[in-house]
């Protein structure tokens, strides 16, 4: 009986520690790409990205308010004069800027490009961690060499995706086929300025996302309450976005949303991505760390391609395929370097985590199943 109970305990611990986080992160990637696709469809019908950003934070705040009151733990809310509140406000400012830049980038390009560029996140995070002395560089270490090489390869892949669009390799059957008079040479030598601008904006977004990860880690160390932190984050982002978006959007009538794809995109983004998606990301960051979360980024490319072709009639371009392959190679090189570094530290008996403290198996199971 004891043995059976022990086996059940181990199985339950594995389920809470590995299966639940994995399923949650896959679901978040699907929801995020779905939000990008829906937003792109809404912008094609005239939705202003300022309106989208403002209402996204408003909806997320309203959704999380009752949840923070119901599921909030006994820890008191941080005072406005404490470092916790200042860090949450700074987190909201960075998150607001990243969402504004990202929405504009998708307007210029596509959700598929956004998913491809998102693979820069680990490289950016590593670079920022080095700059802020949160990561140690030992040039003779294979782990450090892998992270440096992976960062360079990732940036190279992003440049390919941004600067080289190339011919179509996959398109919706309902789209008009390209003219046979357009030569491959014209595809190779042509530059789409909108595509390049969109790519640069999206690269800026994921640089800000990397900054957001580091700040979020600091907040969770000071105040480890996921739902409350995300609620305060969205509340501060709402207060920041209100004057900016109302000033930037000259047509106030655009803030009146009628039933349709525009209203659906706002409700979807605020009700799922900025609220529950942010809570799951924060929980996963606290439980597994930022490297684990970033492992799921390449999955978003496949999801974005499928959704873009099916719902937007987007085409898949050769440059995106080649660049995404290079990006993924660099991405997994950085991840291998990080995993190698962690294994060396484990063997050496050191317990050092640059972004978040590690958890024991029992603590992880408790965190994941709370």
UniProtKB/Swiss-Prot annotation:
Bilayer-spanning residue ranges: 19-39, 51-71, 83-103, 112-132, 143-163, 195-215, 227-247, 260-280, 292-311, 315-337
GO cellular component, one term: membrane
Topology versus the membrane: Multi-pass membrane protein
One function term, GO molecular function aspect: transmembrane transporter activity
Keywords: Membrane, Repeat, Transmembrane, Transmembrane helix
Keyword Repeat: yes
PANTHER family per UniProt: WAT1-RELATED PROTEIN
Family according to the record: Belongs to the drug/metabolite transporter (DMT) superfamily. Plant drug/metabolite exporter (P-DME) (TC 2.A.7.4) family.
Localization per Swiss-Prot or TrEMBL: Membrane
Domain EamA: 33-162, 210-335
Name of this chain's protein: WAT1-related protein At5g40230
Pfam families: EamA
Stored InterPro entries: EamA_dom, WAT1-related
Domain of life of the native organism: Eukaryota
């Amino acid at each position: 009986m004891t043995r059976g109970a022990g086996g059940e305990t181990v199985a339950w611990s594995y389920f809470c520690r590995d299966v639940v986080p994995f399923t949650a992160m896959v679901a978040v990637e699907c929801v995020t790409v779905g939000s990008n696709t829906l937003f792109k469809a809404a912008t094609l019908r005239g939705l202003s990205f300022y309106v989208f950003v403002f209402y996204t934070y408003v909806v997320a705040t309203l959704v999380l308010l009752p949840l923070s009151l119901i599921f909030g733990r006994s820890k008191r809310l941080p005072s406005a004069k404490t470092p916790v509140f200042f860090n949450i406000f700074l987190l909201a400012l960075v998150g607001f800027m990243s969402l504004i830049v990202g929405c504009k980038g998708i307007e210029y390009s596509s959700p598929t490009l956004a998913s491809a560029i998102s693979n820069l996140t680990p490289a950016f995070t590593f670079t920022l961690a080095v700059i802020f002395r949160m990561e140690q560089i030992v040039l003779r270490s294979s782990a450090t060499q892998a992270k440096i090489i992976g960062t360079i390869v990732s940036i190279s892949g992003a440049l390919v995706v941004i600067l080289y669009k190339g011919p179509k390799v996959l398109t919706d059957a309902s789209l008009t086929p390209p003219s046979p008079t357009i030569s491959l040479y014209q595809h190779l030598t042509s530059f789409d300025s909108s595509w390049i601008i969109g790519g640069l904006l999206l690269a800026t977004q994921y640089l800000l996302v990397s900054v957001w990860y580091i700040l979020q880690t600091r907040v969770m160390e000071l105040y480890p309450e996921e739902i409350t932190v995300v609620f305060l984050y969205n509340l501060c982002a709402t207060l920041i976005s209100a004057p900016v978006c109302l000033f930037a959007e000259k047509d106030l009538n655009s803030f009146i949303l009628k039933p349709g794809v525009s209203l659906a995109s706002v409700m979807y983004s605020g009700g799922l991505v900025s609220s529950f998606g942010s809570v799951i990301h924060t929980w996963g960051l606290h439980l597994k760390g930022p490297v684990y979360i970033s492992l799921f980024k390449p999955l978003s490319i496949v999801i974005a391609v499928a959704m873009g072709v099916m719902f937007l009639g987007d085409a898949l371009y050769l440059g995106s395929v080649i660049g995404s392959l290079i990006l993924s190679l660099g991405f997994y090189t950085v991840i291998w370097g990080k995993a190698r570094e962690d294994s060396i530290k484990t063997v050496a008996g050191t317990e050092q985590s640059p972004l978040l403290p590690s958890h024991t198996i029992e603590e992880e199971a408790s965190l994941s199943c709370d």
